[in-house]
Amino acid sequence: MFLGIDCGTQGTKVLVLDTESGTVLGEGSASHSLISDHNGRREQDVGQWLNALQQATRDALAQSGVSGQQILGIGVSGQQHGLVLLDAQGEVLRPAKLWCDTESAPENQRLLDYLGGAQGSLQRLGLVIAPGYTVSKLLWTKEQYPQLFERIDKVLLPHDYLNYWLTGRCCTEFGDASGTGYFNVRTREWDLPLLAHIDPSGRLGKALPQLVQAHEAVGVLHPEIARLLDLNPAALVSSGGGDNMMGAIGTGNIQPGLITMSLGSSGTVYAYADEARVSEHESVATFCSSSGGWLPLICTMNLTNATTAIRELFALDIAGFNQTVAEAPIGAEGVLILPFLNGERVPALPDATGSIVGLDSTNLTQANLSRAVVEGTTFGLRYGLDLLRDSGIKSEKIRLIGGGSKSAVWRQIVADIMNTPVICTDHAEAAALGAAIQAAWCWSHADGKAEGLQQLCERCVSLDQNSETHPVVHNVAAYQQVYQRYQAQLRKF
């Protein structure tokens, strides 16, 4: 039995996985809240993560009927790019700045200029640093909180911090490290000179966690944490990884030929690669995977956050919102929403704001606005998918995950806009499932069995055949015209 933990933006999810049968026996969840400001600040109190982890673990075990003493391993998935700073006593210095935080966008631009622009960043790191990456948060912290900066002893990502809390050991793996902006994805090494540019004292380089291989365990549970969670004190904690890397494992996307698309708070599209094929498109991030390879990826900053904003504006529940979307025709009678509520990464418009185009006295309806926001967010994913395809990524089918994938009308919109069949996994929360599968993989290595990750995925990742959705020919043609309008609007920014 293995635990998979996913610490996301909106909450923490935990599941209990029986890897012998490939069955999820129980699930639990608990929510987080955001610290937000109009200047782009998006932070969280990491204490919420710990409280949510404890609650969700208790609930998952209770639902499963499994004793915590039967748990052999634990895997942690975490939201990427977040910055958790600890002092020499292991205390958190300030709230964690998150992936969706754009307060440090000016610092990111200064660092990008130092690297020689997009091409210089690609050449040096294998990707282009973007607002939201960890590196600019460090420069921001130094300039905004200089006294606090001098107390930094450990620089961690969200999943690193949870692994540290669970085991007492500071380390990270290549996948999540890829999203820091101070890691070379080709050589899989920290870029220490870049950190020395931010702070010549060398403090930051000394504060970095040790790098470990994806199949390596971090260690066993700390005895105090094992008692707190009522878990087997000999349970191994795996290397873990970022939520996208764990989502790849949780959808079986660990070899070339598959594309995973996540309809979550952010939107992501990614595929596995055997080598670091750095794209010429600066919006494509060639991250490392948490399964031993690489994970070319695009990320949009606005997805269910935008659809939720419209849904709540109209006081609709999810079922009512989906019905309202279905009532409007393709193209929402000319209404087009560019849903850039948090700026945007793909397309690269960090300073953009949202807009509604094409409104008149005849098409201003709940149905049109509801459909337009779903279409607008999906067009952003199409923009990114085109970049991946242009970089040589191919797939005959898309595996959909995330909250939005539960909507039948949204699945049809995705299939039509992408002109590709889509199918959901049985477990939409693929990151938690991937974390549990990776935990089993790490445990098998430590136990001397070395069961292959492919075998585990084949046994534990199942597809929901009832969700399979194919593009409709006349819908594809209609959406191509609407997408061209979307592209024309982008050129005005």
Segments predicted by a language model, with ranges:
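N-terminal glycine/serine-rich phosphate-binding loop of ATP-dependent small-molecule kinases
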Residues: 1-94, 123, 226-227, 231, ...
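Active-site core segments that coordinate phosphate-bearing ligands/cofactors
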Residues: 3-5, 112-125, 133, 139-171, ...
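Short, glycine/acidic-enriched loop or turn micro-motifs at the edges of active sites
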Residues: 9, 21, 104, 246, ...
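Residue-level signal for inorganic ion chemistry
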Residues: 22, 45, 74, 101, ...
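A generic structural motif
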Residues: 23, 30-33, 99, 177, ...
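Short, acidic/turn-prone active-site loops that include or flank metal/cofactor-
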Residues: 30, 97-104, 177, 265-267, ...
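Short beta-strand-loop/turn "lid" adjacent to the catalytic site in phosphate-handling enzymes
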Residues: 62-99, 127-132, 163-184, 210-218
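A conserved helix-loop-beta module that forms one wall/lid of the active-site cleft
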Residues: 199-213
